[in-house]
Each structure stands twice: as C-alpha cells, then as structure tokens.
A protein has these predicted regions:
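A domain-start/cap signature at the N-terminus of enzymes
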Residues: 19-54, 85, 102, 131-155, ...
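Alpha/beta-hydrolase-fold serine-hydrolase catalytic core, especially in secreted/extracellular enzymes
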Residues: 182, 217-303
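Residue-level detector of functionally pivotal "anchor" positions at catalytic/ligand-binding pockets or at interdomain
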Residues: 292-324
Length: 349
C-alpha cells in the first residue's frame, strides 16, 4: 500500500523545522481511492534529533478526529510534557469497522499514516501506540491483531473485542494473530449496555471483559490470576468506583490491565462518567512503558514492576473534596498515582 500526501492544512506553526513550536495540523493523504484526513499534534518540546513516539487516538462511531481530541480524549497536555506526537485520524463515514466486501481497509490506512509521518518527523518506530473509544477501541484491538508489526501496545475504552467467528465470518478479517507479546489496557463500564461494549459481552459477536483478559493473558503468557487494587474513590458524586486488575509477568515482561469501572456506563473516565481516574493519563502511563519488544528495560528474570510502589506515575492531584487542581502551597492536597498509591501532601512556603 502506498500513500501520497496531497495536503497539509496548518493550524499552528511557529517554526518550519518544528523546533520549540506547538504544531497542530489537519493533514490529508490519498488512500484507497479517496482523500483521508487525520489530525496531528506535535508538542513544542519535539526535537528532530530524538526518536519520538506516536500515540494514535481513534474516535467512536459517527465521530471524527477533531471531535475525539476536543470532546473525549485530549492528549495535548500530556504530549507537552511526555514528548510524543498525538494522531487523531477520521474514519470513512465516521466508522472504522467495514464489513467485506469493501474497499476500506483502515488497518493499512493507519500504516500509511505511520509511513507518512516517518517521512517528515523522527518517529520512534518501536513506540507506536493506539487507543480508542467505543468503535475506536474495537479498532485498536484490530490493530493489535493485524498490524502488530507496527503497533507496540494498545488500550480500549468502552469498546469490546470481536470474537474470531464474528471477525472472519461477518467482516472477512483474518483471525486475531499478534506477532509479539502485546501490552493491553482496557477500561470497561459494568452497566454499559451498548451491544459492542457490554461488560458481559454479546456472543457470538463481542467478547466479555473476562474473555478479553483471558485472550490476552494467554497470548502473553502472564500470570493466570490478577492483582486487584481498589482505586481511591476521590469523587463520590460520580456514582462509580474503579478496580485495577493487573495480570503480570508476561513474556517480554508485558502485562494486561483492566480498569473496571463499577457502575460505569459508555464513558471516557476523567472526561465524562467516572472521575476517579483520568483515562487519557492512565493510557499513556501504561503504554509508554512498552515498545515493540515488550516492557522497556525488561529483565526477564524479575517480575513486572508496574504495581510496585517505587515505580509510580502521577495521575492527578485533588483537594480533600476530590476536585482536580494543580499543586499549591499551604493547602492539603492528595496525589494519586497509577499504582493505587495516594499521598497526602502539604507544601509550605
């Protein structure tokens, strides 16, 4: 498959060489007989001499890349400090999953985007990640299944995984066959009644949350039983809580993580629905630990360190009422980390 970039609509550009400039572009490539759009965000700290990760974000059915960024999963503030390029493609007709026979094969559209960006930016090809909401989450699983030679790790929010029977018989896709151990995070809601994201699944079409964890823990050869940690219920008004379930010690040190939103609906936690976690930050904290070869700096003789208390990433800061805010002096604040640890802190002048 070949891509020809025919348009780059520049929204913000300070330097033509992308040095010390925030860049947000809507770009277009000619693919599959039509012009296809995707949005990119390049943080000001991007350095052309440093290989930089890509983070794909896929919208839900009926959406588009801009809407995904503005109303669901805005990863720009995270990219500004973590230094990755955020990519928001738009699906044809607002969809990612097209049944055979069809001229749309968005798996290779994504590959065309990777190649297009790699021709202009210094992309770390070992650190290309994908996440999505609803149908975009389902599509992220498809990338892990069918483009695993380019995708290091994936995450899905409120989107299930298709069964192989449904994938092959109805869509004409090959069976899921990842080529390497793949770190996977998924964030389902237990009362989500959308057919393609029900916690209990919808056989023979979509897997349950248990089926998804079973598939990936078996593929990755992780521990069979998860470590379960209750996430602090910092927002008691959202009507939901979160349990973190981690299957550790997989091949190449990869893990599988489920952030189970008890009483959660078809939501993106941190934006709407549950507010105890920020799904965007959780996803980046998780996938960024991995490259195409597994956990970065993996030591195969030791256990995965994702849940060790000395290995933690700050998720958010809240006041005693659970409200988000930045670190402040002379106030009580609670620092929430991705391993379940909560620190109470007062910074004095």
């Amino acid at each position: 498959m070949h891509s020809i970039r025919i348009l780059s609509a520049l929204i913000i550009l300070i330097s033509p060489f992308y040095l010390n400039a925030q860049v947000q572009q809507t770009r277009t490539i000619f693919y599959g007989g039509e012009s296809r759009e995707f949005l990119i965000y390049v943080p000001s700290i991007y350095n052309p001499s440093t290989p930089t990760p890509l983070m794909f974000n896929f919208h839900g059915g009926g959406g588009n890349g801009m809407g995904m960024m503005l109303s669901t999963n805005d990863m720009r503030p995270i990219a500004d400090t973590a230094n990755f390029i955020a990519v928001y493609p738009s699906g044809s007709g607002g969809a990612w999953m097209h049944k055979a026979p069809t001229t749309y094969n968005d798996i290779y559209f994504v590959e065309a985007i990777i190649d297009d960006l790699a021709s202009e930016f210094n992309i770390d090809n070992d650190r290309v990640y994908a996440c999505g909401y609803s149908e975009g989450g389902i599509f992220s699983y498809e990338l892990a299944c069918r483009l695993s030679n380019r995708i290091a790790a994936v995450a899905s929010v409120s989107g299930s995984m298709m069964t192989d029977t449904y994938r092959t018989n109805d869509y004409g896709f090959p069976a899921c066959s990842p080529s390497h151990p793949t770190a996977v995070m998924f964030i389902p809601g237990t009362i989500d009644m959308n057919p393609h994201s029900m916690y209990s699944g919808l056989l023979p079409y979509y897997m349950s949350a248990s089926d998804i964890s079973n598939y990936w823990k078996n593929h990755n050869n992780t521990a069979q039983s998860p470590i379960i940690v209750s996430v602090p219920n910092t927002n008691t008004s959202d009507g939901s809580t979160v349990d973190r379930k981690t299957w550790e010690n997989g091949d190449n040190c990869v893990s599988v993580v489920e952030l189970k939103v008890n009483n959660g609906d078809h939501d993106w936690p941190g934006t709407f629905g549950n507010m105890d976690i920020d799904a965007s930050q959780e996803i980046w904290n998780f996938v960024s630990k991995h490259d195409i070869n597994g956990l970065i700096n993996c030591n195969s003789t030791s256990t995965s360190n994702y849940n060790r208390l000395d290995k933690k990433n700050l998720v958010k800061v809240v006041d005693p009422l659970g409200r988000h805010y930045n670190l402040q002096r002379n106030n009580i604040q609670f620092l929430l980390y991705d391993n379940g640890l909560v620190e109470k802190r007062i910074i004095l002048n």
